[in-house]
Amino acid sequence: MSKIDFRLEKTFGYTTGACAAAGAYSALYFLKNNEKLNFVEILNLKGDSLIIPIKNIEKRGNTAVSTVEKFAGEDIDITNGMDIKIEVILENWDDGYPKPSNVIIIGGTGVGLITKSGLQIKPGDHAINPKPREMIETNLKSLLKDDEYVTVKISVPTGDEIAKKTLNPKLGIVGGISILGTTGIVRPMSNEAYKESLAPQIDVALANNFENLIFVPGNIGTKHAKILLNAEEDQIIEVSNFWDYMLDKAKEKGVKDIMVFGHAGKIVKLAGGIFDTHSRVADARNEILCAYASLVSQDVEMLQKILQSNTTEDIVEILTEKGILSEVFNKVSKRVVERLSLRWEGINFSCIVIDMKGNILGKSD
């Protein structure tokens, strides 16, 4: 078990789920003890202690509203700095009233509403994931008497606008962000929250009975998969740079058939065994394409140009002029399939590589 004091910590951050748990605890504590806390110490589900600052807290009667500012540490997170408001209403059970839970959690403005099947939460409910719900309940129950219960309402004033820059609209989560986080801790450069938002795409696809999924790096792949492959929105899985993570999830969930489809600049990295395609991890595009071009032509001048090219599009132009474009990218596509099949056994892979305009450069079969 460890303790992280986020009043001092600058490297690690805390999740939206941890914000909600901290805010709920501070609001209930204020109602019970008439004392405003500038910070609270809560436990995550692993038993780690998280000390989280409280930005503001107000009380009116049996209701208190706490505001917690999301902090991502050194991680890149679109939700960093946004306010999360947690309203807690403290009440007593009526005699004879059934008591299913003494912590009721609901979503308010800026928290998304689920509209598609396949996610961890059923359609019609707000996008507050099970682990954050459990963290809130665990921390509040220590403050409650047997005859007391609370309603916890989570709102995000800027959630609707922020959600437009996330995958929530694609997942059928409308009107706001999701409240996420397994451990409550955001680790630098881990992109945990972002990864956690990517994986549910697979659940939605499987819930809609798609057997062949199309994995794309991002918007270019999505756009042209719809045009060239007549693919449906829920069949297309945006991977971003996290091929290893998303393919692990696909295998875990029993996916049997995956087409890798997208722009050459990202897909060629897979042929080199690079499964996190962010440029800060590795950028061997020129070297990989030079190697495959050398299998087709030993023109040293051409190979030198490939190595010195600024963009993948420049290399496409060089290979086109030489008349070997398709031959090179067919080899690249086949190697992508070989690489992925070796690591993720049991999944049938295929691959199509395109340029920015959606022209097919190469296929695995």
Swiss-Prot record:
Top-rank taxon: Archaea
Known pathway: Cofactor biosynthesis; adenosylcobalamin biosynthesis; cob(II)yrinate a,c-diamide from sirohydrochlorin (anaerobic route): step 6/10
Catalyzed reactions per annotation: Co-precorrin-5B + S-adenosyl-L-methionine = Co-precorrin-6A + S-adenosyl-L-homocysteine
InterPro entries hit by this protein: CbiD (IPR002748), CbiD_sf (IPR036074)
Keyword Ribonucleoprotein part of the UniProt annotation: no
EC number: 2.1.1.195
Listed GO biological process terms: anaerobic cobalamin biosynthetic process; methylation
Keywords, in A-Z order: Cobalamin biosynthesis, Methyltransferase, S-adenosyl-L-methionine, Transferase
Major enzyme class: transferase
Entry GO MF terms: cobalt-precorrin-5B C1-methyltransferase activity
Protein family according to the UniProt entry: Belongs to the CbiD family.
PANTHER family: COBALT-PRECORRIN-5B C(1)-METHYLTRANSFERASE
Name used for this protein in its record: Cobalt-precorrin-5B C(1)-methyltransferase
Protein encoded by which gene: cbiD
